[in-house]
Amino acid sequence: MPIKAIHQHPLTRRDFLRGTGLAGGLVIGSGIHSLLSSCSPESSSTEIPQKNTIARGPNAKFIPDIEINLKAAPTTVPILPGQTTQVWSYAAQLVKGDPNSLQTIPDSYLGPIIRVRKGQRVRVNFQNNLPQGQASIVHWHGLILPEEMDGHPRFAIGPGQTYVYEFEVINRAGLNWFHPHPDGLTGQQAYAGLAGLFIVTDAEEATLNLPTGAYEIPIVLQDRTLDADNQLLYLGSKIGTPRNSNMGGMQQGNSGHSSNGMMGDMSSMMGFLGQKIFVNGKPNFTLSVATRVYRLRILNGSNSRIYKLAWSSGEPLTIIGTDGSLLTHPTKRKYVMLAPGERIDIWADFSKLKVGTEVSLNSLAFSGAENVGGSNMGGMMSSGNAPELGSAMMLFNVKIEREEKESLRLPSQLAALPLLRPEDAVNATQPRPIELSLKGMKWVINGQPFEMNTALPQETVKLNSIEQWEIVNKLNPGAMMDAKGMAHPIHLHGVHFQVISREVLPELAAGWQTVKDGYVDEGLKDTVMVMPGERVKLLMKFEKYSGLYTYHCHTLEHEDSGMMRNYRVKE
C-alpha cells in the first residue's frame, strides 16, 4: 500500500493564521500548574478553573523541529463506486521540518501519518473548521505530554478557532495516534473520519533492522455503515446532514453529555457497531505483498468493536510491540485481542508462501463481551444489520504478488524497557480501586459520571510516585435485567502502565476463556481491555508532568455518555 509524503509547502504559519482570519481567535494552552498548585493540599475539593486558555500566539521561545498546520473540516471522498461520501477529515500542511515527517494514505478520509524522532520538538496549529455546534480538540493518544497539550476536553475550541500545540516528544519508539476528544462529541467526530497516526522512532529501534519504508504497513481497523447513497450513518443519521451537524441530532443535557431519549441511552450503553469493516478508510481491502517480511502496525480505530485477530492459515501471530513501546523480546499468540484504542505491532513473514497465494487476517468468534439485558443488543445501534460483537469476520486479504529476496531476521531482543516492580508501588498492598458499573442506563467509573473540572481527593496522585491501580468490571444486579456488564477498554492519558495480573469471576469464566490467551500484556500500554467480571491490576509511575488528565472507557459512546473521570498529578 503506497504511503505518500506531504512535501514542504511554502505556506508559513503566519500565512496560515492570516488566511484563516483568526489572528485574534487563536488559543494556546497556557501554563496552569500555578493554578493547580494554588489548591490547598488540605482541601477536600479539587475543582479546577474552567477552560484556562489565553487568546495569544505561539510561544516565541519554542523553536520547533517540525511544524504542521492541521485542519479538521468536512470533505468528500470516494469509498464505493457511485456517489462520493461526506466525511470529516484532518488535512495537514508541513510548515517546517523533514518532508518525510508528514505522509498521507491516498484516497482515504483518514488524517495524515506524522513521523517523528524521540527528542524532536513539534508545533501543531490545529484549526477547527467543523460545522457549527462541533467544538473539538485533538488528543495525542499514547504520547506523554503536559496537560495543556494532551487534548483534555476542557480545552475544546469552537468552529473557526485555532489551538496551538507545542511539545517535545519524550516517548519511546511506538505507534500512537490522534483523534478528537471533546466532551459528548468524540464518538461522532471520530466516526465521521477524524483520526490519524503519530509514529515515534528512536535510536534503539534503529539498531534492530526492522522492516521500513514500503514494508512497514500501517493498518487502521474500523467498522462503518453506509446507506444506499454511500453516506455514513451514525445513530440513525447521515454524517454531514443538518441533523448530524449538531451532535448527530442529539440534544445536550445539563451534564454536557449527549442524549436522544431511548435511542441515545441505548447507544451510550451498547456502543455503535458498523456493517462493514474498513481498513485504512476502505472496505474490501486487499494488501499486496512480496515473499518477504513486513511490519504490520495495527490500530483498532473503531468506536466500539473489539477484534480477535488471527491468520486464516492458522499460523501464530508474531508480536514485537504494543501500545506504548516495542516488547523486550518477540512473543507469539494464536490470536490477539485488540480493543478500541489499542495497537499491536506484528512481524509478518510471507517468505515461505508462493506467488498467487492468498491469506487473510480474520477476527475470530468470541463471547462474553456483552451481557446486558440477557442478549446482544449492540446491533441495535448499527443503523442496520451489523455483525454482533464477537462475530467471526474477515478483516482484510493478503495476496502474494511477487517474489523478493531479503535478509531480515527476527531479533531475539527488542527494547530494554524500564519495567517497574509491583512491590515498589506506594500502595502495593492496597491498589487504587477503579470500579466500572452501570448506573441506570449509563456506564460510570466509581459510581460517578464525568465532571469537566473536578478530580476528587481519591483521584489525586503524587508526581514521581509508583502506584498500583485495580480495575474491576463489576456485575450490576438489579440493573437492566441483572446486567452482567460489557467489556470496557480503559485508556489512561498522560501515563504508560504495565499489566501485572488478571482474574475473573467464576460465573463469567466461560466468555473470558474465549479471549484470555489473546491478551498481550507485555510491554508498556496505555489502553487495557477489561472483560465483564474481570479484575485487572496495573502498575505505573506518574513522572515528567503534573496536572489534570482523564481516564475513560475507549468505547466512544460510553465515553461520550460520561464514562470518564479526571485524575490529578500533584507535585
At which residue positions do the language-model features occur?
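Active-site pocket scaffolds in enzymes
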Residues: 83-86, 136, 140-142, 148-153, ...
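Short, aromatic- and glycine-rich surface loops/edge beta-strands on solvent-exposed regions
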Residues: 176-181, 357-365, 549-553
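C-terminal motif of bacterial Sec signal peptides marking the signal peptidase cleavage site
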Residues: 37-38
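N-terminal secretory signal peptides
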Residues: 1-15, 22, 30-34
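Histidine-centered copper-binding motifs that mark active-site loops
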Residues: 2-9, 21, 41-339, 346, ...
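Short, surface-exposed loop/turn segments at beta-strand-coil junctions that are enriched for proline
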Residues: 168-172, 349-355, 542-546
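Repeat-solenoid scaffold signature
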Residues: 336-338, 342-367
